Amino acid sequence: MNQWLCKVLGLALLVFGLGPVWAQKSTQLHWYGQAAFKIETPSGGVLLIDPWLNVPTNPDKQSIDKLGRVDYILVTHGHRDHIGEAVEIAKKTGAELVAPYGLQFNMKSVLGYPEKQATGATGGNIGGQIMLPKAGAKVTLVHAAHGSDITPPTIAEPAAGGLAAIHAGNPVGYVIQIDGGPTLYHTGDTDVYQDMKLIPEFFKVDLMLACIGGHFTMDPKRAALAVEWVQPKQVMPMHFGTYGLLAGTPAQFKAALTQRGIGDRMIEMKPGEDRAL
């Protein structure tokens, strides 16, 4: 009788999601290069962040063709290396656009993002939280110290009568909380800023995806200070080495973290790699 009861209880635990750790699905992270990531959640949902999949450092030149399910596309700001192929992917997959309202509006009106896939349900602003039920996740928009402009596809020099770049609202970073999985902080393009100290007041970040390239964003030394303030369990460098101006390196970042006593928090990925979280 006892053996029979144990079997029944064990089956019930698995059915109701209370089974052993090995029965749970992990969160999968894929890095395409620059600031572009794919996140597959334990529920089977798929998020893309800043989907420049054709970034030169991505070894897989068929990444867009290989995409299957995509539920949401998160874009941090309007620069081309972050919008990437978002519109093409949205038309292919039906993915909804998560972005600040100003950026969301201009991606629809200027770039042709499908209207029904970019609504108030997934548009927001700094401090707001957006539920992503298809992916079993929620995302909070946080500040990023950067710019955000959309360049129309037909842009020419303003002096020649062409369109100028269009302001696209405030740039943001995203804190992504995954049901049954980790909390990630994608910084977007940013410098270090004082309000990063507020992030650990509200979130326990498991993995911080931090830009380190410099010139347009914080460099390795400034990024190390950002990590000290955010207090993630782990940090992965991104947005470096895509072209010459992004000269910051993971080795420099590791050294700067080590000087602050937190060098063991850094993990590395190469473009095209996957990691279970």
What are these language model-derived features?
Residues 2-46, 53-55, 142, 146, ...:
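Zn-dependent metallo-beta-lactamase
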Residues 24-27, 41-47, 129-140, 177-184, ...:
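Beta-strand-turn-beta hairpins that frame and shape the catalytic cleft
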Residues 32-34, 42, 68, 125, ...:
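Extracytoplasmic
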Residues 41-80, 84-91, 99, 110, ...:
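Pre-active-site segment of Zn-dependent metallo-hydrolases
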Residues 48-50, 70-78, 98-101, 184-188, ...:
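Active-site neighborhood of phospho(di)ester-bond hydrolases with catalytic His/Asp-centered motifs
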Residues 55-56, 80-84, 104-107, 126-130, ...:
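Active-site environment of divalent metal-dependent phosphoester hydrolases
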Residues 97, 109-133, 224, 228-277:
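Binuclear metal-ion centers of metallo-dependent hydrolases, dominated by the metallo-beta-lactamase
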Residues 159-228:
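Active-site-proximal loop/helix segments of hydrolase catalytic cores
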